């Protein structure tokens, strides 16, 4: 259940491991990859930032290798172009050192600390006091990769089906099979796998999971460089992230279509699947604001939240953030681009769950938390779930 890239990769990996299994993939939208997958930065992450030994670190690194190989084999538009993580202030150097050490522990290939002159050789318009060169980072068409995974899986088994515009309304659990009531009728299945992204908590509860945490959505807005300014960014430029927040900071990304995006910021959204600055859902807002963890998150990060909101509605403030890395950017160089929404699994104490989280409930597997770098890690997550399904469900 769920047709983003994690759901697609899981569908694909299950079908490869169990070619005789008849699998149905339900997606409530008219298109695959229509939410987080289709609105992210399009970056193949290296695994640089993640705690050694965590699910994020292990699956990102394995998943990156698999994703690049998959893209090469199936003609998915991608480019392993590398990125620089740059420090613009001396106060950022301890965090940069910490990130570099984490990268070494995670055995990220080819990373090196570089000075300001070396940064300029890679990105001539960047002003920094040094950085980290990460040659194995890249860019990819995640929508295309998602579609190809599903296409291959469907071609392997005539009995497997894709159901688009089919929203799961409720689930009745039986001793042998579950009945999935959808917007297009009822279906029976023996085993269920949920990769529902922004709706992960709601579907888990519909499946009987007693979940204390709740998903909260954060919108990220992007600007684009004008055609005349695109030469100021060669590939990928990231700031040194603040370790107190679950975001990597506003960065520059050359996309696979040649456009250059700047962003995203991170603001609480009043609609989980809302991409406009004024989008509103009464249910989503009610659920978020009646949950104690949301208020604790707000109070614990008050100044960060206020600054992000101000920047969301001020091109001038957004530009000022970008100019920390590329000082010669001007107001005329950027124009508003698209937005994305990120699902964060939030605990009652206001803490965001950082690592991937996959849980089991009877004959169900739930991907409850799959923040960045889940798209990069998707094939590894899919393999992990396929392997766990063998153990949990005794599949042969």
PLM segments and residue spans:
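Flavin-dependent oxidoreductases
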Residues: 9, 171-281
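Flavin-binding catalytic cores
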Residues: 105, 210-212, 229-230, 255-339
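Beta1/beta-strand and adjacent pyrophosphate-binding region of the FAD-binding site
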Residues: 1-6, 24
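C-terminal catalytic lobe of FAD-dependent flavoproteins
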Residues: 297-396
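Helical element adjacent to the flavin cofactor pocket in flavoenzyme catalytic cores
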Residues: 132-191, 195-196, 202, 377-390
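Short beta-strand to alpha-helix junction loop
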Residues: 51-62, 86-95, 132-151, 163, ...
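Dinucleotide-binding Rossmann-like beta1-alpha1 core, especially the glycine-rich loop
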Residues: 42-118, 122, 128, 249-250, ...
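Glycine-rich FAD pyrophosphate-binding loop
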Residues: 15-39
């Amino acid at each position: 259940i769920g047709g983003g890239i994690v759901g697609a990769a899981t569908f694909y990996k299950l079908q490869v491991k169990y070619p005789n299994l008849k699998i149905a993939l339900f997606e409530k939208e008219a298109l695959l990859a229509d939410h987080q997958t289709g609105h992210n930065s399009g970056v193949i992450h290296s695994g640089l930032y993640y705690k050694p030994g965590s699910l994020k670190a292990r699956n990102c690194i394995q998943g990156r290798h698999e994703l690049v190989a998959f893209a090469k084999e199936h003609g998915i538009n991608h480019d392993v172009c590398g990125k620089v993580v740059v420090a613009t202030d001396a106060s950022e150097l301890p965090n940069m050192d910490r990130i570099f050490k984490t990268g070494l522990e995670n055995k990220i290939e080819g990373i090196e600390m570089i000075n300001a002159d070396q940064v300029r050789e890679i990105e001539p318009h960047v002003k920094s006091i040094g950085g980290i060169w990460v040659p194995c980072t890249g860019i990819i068409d995640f929508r295309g990769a998602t579609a190809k995974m599903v296409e291959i899986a469907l071609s392997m088994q005539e009995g497997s089906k894709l159901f688009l515009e089919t929203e799961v309304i409720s689930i009745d659990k039986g001793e042998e099979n579950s009945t999935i009531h959808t917007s297009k009728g009822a279906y029976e299945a023996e085993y269920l796998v949920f990769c529902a992204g922004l709706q992960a908590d709601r579907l888990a509860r519909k499946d009987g999971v007693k979940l204390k945490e709740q998903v909260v959505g954060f919108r990220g807005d992007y600007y684009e460089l004008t055609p005349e300014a695109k030469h100021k960014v060669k590939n990928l430029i990231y700031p040194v992230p603040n370790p107190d927040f679950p975001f990597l900071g506003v960065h520059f990304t050359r996309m696979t279509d040649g456009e250059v995006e700047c962003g995203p910021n991170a603001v609480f959204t009043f609609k989980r699947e809302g991409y406009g600055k004024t989008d509103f859902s009464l249910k989503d807002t009610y659920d978020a604001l009646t949950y104690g963890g949301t208020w604790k998150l707000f109070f614990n990060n008050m100044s960060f939240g206020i600054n992000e909101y101000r920047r969301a509605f001020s091109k001038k403030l957004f530009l000022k953030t970008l100019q920390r890395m590329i000082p010669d950017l001007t107001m005329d160089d950027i124009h508003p681009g698209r937005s994305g929404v990120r699902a964060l699994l939030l605990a009652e104490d206001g803490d965001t769950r950082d690592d991937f989280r996959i849980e089991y409930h009877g004959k169900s597997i739930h991907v409850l938390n799959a923040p960045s770098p889940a798209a990069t890690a998707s094939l590894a997550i899919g393999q992990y779930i396929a392997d766990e399904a063998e153990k949990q469900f005794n599949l042969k």
